[in-house]
Amino acid sequence: MRLVLVRHGESEWNKLNLFTGWTDVDLSEKGVEEAKEGGTYLKKEGFDFDICYTSYLKRAIHTLNYILSQMDREWLPVIKTWKLNERHYGGLQGLNKAETAEKYGEDQVKIWRRSFDIAPPVLEEGDKRCPYLQEQYRGIEKSELPLTESLKDTIARAVPFFEKTIKPQMLEGKRILITAHGNSLRALVKYFENLSDEEIISVNIPTGVPLVYEFDKNFKVLSKRYLGDQEKINAKINAVANQGKKK
């Protein structure tokens, strides 16, 4: 069985080094090109899909659209779910990562960004950034929607969705593409590879690069690989790792 994961292309706030979370910002020009390049590599290597999954956030949705356009597969069914949204960064959303590191220290920012079970400061009730005040979540119970999340919290929504919805389809032979976010994809990577809480801290996923997993019938990982220029991919991974450091 094969599964392809793609983190959305660079967003406008990635470019500005801001904590984004559930803020619904679009792709930058570079992000559009990354998404198209990802689609080109998938087509070049002969990939095809039956069902696609993405989040409620336009940077992931648009990345998927560009990928499918490059593959001439815009007619494929697409299922959107908030369960694949980025981790909610609470009160950090909209703040510059480097400036936050200057204020609180790199160690604290790394804990907020990369720790397993420590969430950033919670949003106050009524803050305009609260998901329950936003249109795309109007059909979801307020109690289900986070005001901040740790990676552990993100796993608690993303992995059960995968197990209940996507995994059975894969076992039926469906070819699946998931276009989502750094932390919702890290949640799945931790689950697939049975990584420890400490090991996942150092995992960084580059923007716009297809990550291909091969599984056996028992869902054990047989192989994983990124599609594309490996030197460029490594540079992207290092750039993600350095986002929370002082200027």
From Swiss-Prot:
The record's annotation in InterPro entries points to: His_Pase_superF_clade-1, His_PPase_superfam, PG/BPGM_mutase_AS, Phosphogly_mut1
Which residues constitute the catalytic centre? H8 (tele-phosphohistidine intermediate), E86 (proton donor/acceptor)
Reading the lineage from the top rank, the first entry is Bacteria
Q: Please list the reactions this protein catalyses.
A: (2R)-2-phosphoglycerate = (2R)-3-phosphoglycerate
| Entries under CDD domains matching the protein | HP_PGM_like
Provide the GO MF annotations for this entry.
Answer: phosphoglycerate mutase activity
**Isomerase in keyword set:** yes
Q: Does this entry carry the keyword Isomerase?
A: yes
Q: Where does substrate bind?
A: 7-14, 20-21, 59, 86-89, 97, 113-114, 182-183
Sorted alphabetically, the Gene Ontology BP terms of this entry are: gluconeogenesis; glycolytic process
Q: In which pathway does it act?
A: Carbohydrate degradation; glycolysis; pyruvate from D-glyceraldehyde 3-phosphate: step 3/5
Q: Name one Pfam family in it.
A: His_Phos_1
Q: Which keywords belong to this entry?
A: Gluconeogenesis, Glycolysis, Isomerase
Q: Where is this site: Transition state stabilizer?
A: H181
For this protein, what is the EC number? Answer: 5.4.2.11
Biological function? Catalyzes the interconversion of 2-phosphoglycerate and 3-phosphoglycerate.
Q: What family name appears in the similarity comment?
A: Belongs to the phosphoglycerate mutase family. BPG-dependent PGAM subfamily.
Spell out the protein name for this chain: 2,3-bisphosphoglycerate-dependent phosphoglycerate mutase
Q: Which organism is it from?
A: Treponema denticola (strain ATCC 35405 / DSM 14222 / CIP 103919 / JCM 8153 / KCTC 15104)
